[in-house]
Amino acid sequence: MKKKSLFLFVLLFVFINIVAQKKEICIIKTSLGDITVELYAKKAPITVANFLKYVDAHLYDNTSFFRSVTLNNQPKDSVKIEVIQGGEIDSTKVFTAIPLERTTKTGILHKNGTLSMARDKPDSATCSFFICINDQPSLDYKGKRNKDGQGFAAFGKVTKGMNVAKIIQQLHPEQGQYFKPEVTILSISRKQ
C-alpha cells in the first residue's frame, strides 16, 4: 500500500511539473501571414495575463498593425528604434492598465523578435503591443527611448513568422510611422 501511495504521489508530482512548464504559445493571424509567439508567463506573469485576457475575449480580432518605426521615419528622435505596433482596441472595451513589469525584474530584454507592451507613462499599458525588429536595448530599463527610463514590459518572443513582421515594417516607408492601409490582425489565439 505504501509503495502504491508513493508511486501515485511521484506520478502526481511529475504531472504537475509538466503542466507548470507548458509553454504558452499564441498565433497572430494577419492578412500577410502568421506570426507565432511564445509568452513568458513565469517571468512576466502580470503582462502575460493581461495579453491573454484580450486574446481569450477575442478583442484583438480584426484589429491591426498600424505603426511601423524604422530608422528612417523618426527624424526628431535622437534614440532610434525599429518596431511594429498593433492591437489598438476600442477604448470602451479596454481593460484596466497594468503595473509595469520592468526588464530588471523579468530579465526579458528587447532583442530581435521580442513581444512587448506599448505604454505612455509607467503603469499605463493596456492592449497595444509591439514586436522588436532587431535588438532594441534603448527599450529596456534605463534605456534612453522614453524619458522616464523605466523601459517597456517585454513578455514574449516571436518563434515563427519574423519574416512577416519584417514585411509589415517595410510596407509603406513613404507614409511615416502610421500607415494606411493598416495590416489586419485577423485573430490572435492560443495554440492548442
Q: Where on the chain are the PLM-derived regions?
A:
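Cyclophilin-like peptidyl-prolyl cis-trans isomerases
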Residues: 18-192
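Bacterial Sec-dependent N-terminal signal peptides
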Residues: 1-23
